Amino acid sequence: MKSPKYRPGTTNRITVTSVREDACTYNTDTPEALHRFWCDVIAAQPEHEPDKETVVVVMMNARLRPYAWHRVSLGSVSECSAQPREIFRPVIAAGAYGFALTHNHPSGDPSPSRADEAITRRINEA
Protein backbone atom coordinates (compact mmCIF):
# COMPACT_ATOMS: atom_id res chain seq x y z
CA MET A 1 0.00 0.00 0.00
CA LYS A 2 1.44 3.33 -1.05
CA SER A 3 1.65 6.16 1.42
CA PRO A 4 0.18 9.50 0.32
CA LYS A 5 2.61 11.95 -1.22
CA TYR A 6 4.09 14.48 1.14
CA ARG A 7 2.93 18.02 0.44
CA PRO A 8 4.76 20.78 2.36
CA GLY A 9 2.47 22.72 4.66
CA THR A 10 -0.25 20.08 4.76
CA THR A 11 -1.09 16.73 6.30
CA ASN A 12 -4.14 14.57 5.93
CA ARG A 13 -5.79 16.58 8.69
CA ILE A 14 -4.27 20.05 8.82
CA THR A 15 -3.78 22.78 6.26
CA VAL A 16 -1.77 25.75 7.45
CA THR A 17 -2.12 28.84 5.30
CA SER A 18 1.00 30.97 5.02
CA VAL A 19 0.40 34.68 4.87
CA ARG A 20 2.07 37.17 2.58
CA GLU A 21 5.62 38.00 3.54
CA ASP A 22 4.58 41.59 4.25
CA ALA A 23 2.01 40.31 6.77
CA CYS A 24 4.93 39.69 9.12
CA THR A 25 5.07 43.45 9.56
CA TYR A 26 1.85 43.30 11.59
CA ASN A 27 2.44 44.05 15.24
CA THR A 28 0.01 41.79 17.08
CA ASP A 29 0.64 42.80 20.67
CA THR A 30 -2.82 44.27 21.27
CA PRO A 31 -6.38 43.07 20.61
CA GLU A 32 -6.81 45.98 18.20
CA ALA A 33 -3.77 44.88 16.19
CA LEU A 34 -5.07 41.30 16.02
CA HIS A 35 -8.43 42.67 14.87
CA ARG A 36 -6.67 44.57 12.08
CA PHE A 37 -4.83 41.37 11.06
CA TRP A 38 -8.18 39.51 11.02
CA CYS A 39 -9.81 42.17 8.83
CA ASP A 40 -6.88 42.59 6.44
CA VAL A 41 -5.82 38.96 6.05
CA ILE A 42 -8.36 36.41 7.28
CA ALA A 43 -11.60 38.20 6.38
CA ALA A 44 -10.15 39.02 2.96
CA GLN A 45 -9.96 35.32 2.02
CA PRO A 46 -12.59 34.20 -0.51
CA GLU A 47 -13.58 31.24 1.69
CA HIS A 48 -14.25 33.44 4.75
CA GLU A 49 -17.91 33.36 5.84
CA PRO A 50 -18.57 36.52 7.91
CA ASP A 51 -22.11 35.43 8.76
CA LYS A 52 -20.81 32.39 10.70
CA GLU A 53 -18.63 32.23 13.80
CA THR A 54 -15.13 31.17 12.81
CA VAL A 55 -12.30 30.15 15.13
CA VAL A 56 -8.82 30.81 13.73
CA VAL A 57 -5.43 30.19 15.29
CA VAL A 58 -2.69 32.60 14.15
CA MET A 59 0.87 31.27 14.31
CA MET A 60 3.61 33.74 15.24
CA ASN A 61 7.38 33.91 14.98
CA ALA A 62 9.78 34.81 17.81
CA ARG A 63 8.95 38.50 17.33
CA LEU A 64 5.27 37.61 17.77
CA ARG A 65 4.51 38.56 14.20
CA PRO A 66 2.02 36.37 12.31
CA TYR A 67 3.33 34.13 9.55
CA ALA A 68 0.52 31.57 9.17
CA TRP A 69 -3.03 30.84 10.24
CA HIS A 70 -5.43 27.90 10.37
CA ARG A 71 -9.22 27.85 10.54
CA VAL A 72 -9.94 25.57 13.48
CA SER A 73 -13.71 25.59 13.32
CA LEU A 74 -16.63 27.05 11.39
CA GLY A 75 -19.87 27.32 13.31
CA SER A 76 -23.28 28.87 13.01
CA VAL A 77 -24.54 32.42 13.35
CA SER A 78 -24.28 32.31 17.13
CA GLU A 79 -21.78 29.63 18.15
CA CYS A 80 -18.66 27.73 17.24
CA SER A 81 -16.85 25.00 19.14
CA ALA A 82 -13.18 24.07 19.30
CA GLN A 83 -11.18 21.64 21.38
CA PRO A 84 -7.66 22.37 22.66
CA ARG A 85 -6.18 19.54 20.55
CA GLU A 86 -7.68 21.13 17.40
CA ILE A 87 -6.07 24.43 18.36
CA PHE A 88 -2.62 23.17 19.35
CA ARG A 89 -2.15 20.68 16.49
CA PRO A 90 -1.59 23.27 13.71
CA VAL A 91 0.51 25.42 16.06
CA ILE A 92 2.86 22.51 16.69
CA ALA A 93 2.82 21.38 13.04
CA ALA A 94 3.81 24.88 11.90
CA GLY A 95 6.61 25.09 14.48
CA ALA A 96 5.19 28.33 15.85
CA TYR A 97 6.96 30.23 18.61
CA GLY A 98 3.63 31.63 19.78
CA PHE A 99 0.01 31.83 18.73
CA ALA A 100 -3.19 33.83 19.12
CA LEU A 101 -6.63 32.28 19.15
CA THR A 102 -9.13 34.53 17.40
CA HIS A 103 -12.76 34.37 16.35
CA ASN A 104 -15.48 36.62 15.06
CA HIS A 105 -18.95 37.45 16.35
CA PRO A 106 -21.31 37.85 13.38
CA SER A 107 -23.68 39.81 15.63
CA GLY A 108 -21.06 42.55 15.93
CA ASP A 109 -21.15 42.42 19.74
CA PRO A 110 -17.56 41.76 20.90
CA SER A 111 -18.60 40.80 24.45
CA PRO A 112 -17.38 37.29 25.34
CA SER A 113 -20.08 34.66 25.64
CA ARG A 114 -20.13 31.93 28.29
CA ALA A 115 -18.86 29.53 25.63
CA ASP A 116 -15.96 31.93 24.90
CA GLU A 117 -15.05 32.00 28.57
CA ALA A 118 -15.31 28.20 28.85
CA ILE A 119 -12.96 27.52 25.92
CA THR A 120 -10.52 30.10 27.30
CA ARG A 121 -10.45 28.20 30.60
CA ARG A 122 -9.95 24.85 28.82
CA ILE A 123 -7.05 26.21 26.78
CA ASN A 124 -5.40 27.75 29.85
CA GLU A 125 -5.70 24.39 31.62
CA ALA A 126 -4.18 22.56 28.64
Pin down the residues of each PLM region.
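Active-site-proximal loop/helix of nucleotide/amide-processing enzymes and allied scaffolds
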Residues: M1-A23, M59-R63, S73-A126
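Glycine-enriched loop-and-adjacent helix/strand subsegments that border the catalytic/binding cleft
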Residues: D22-R65
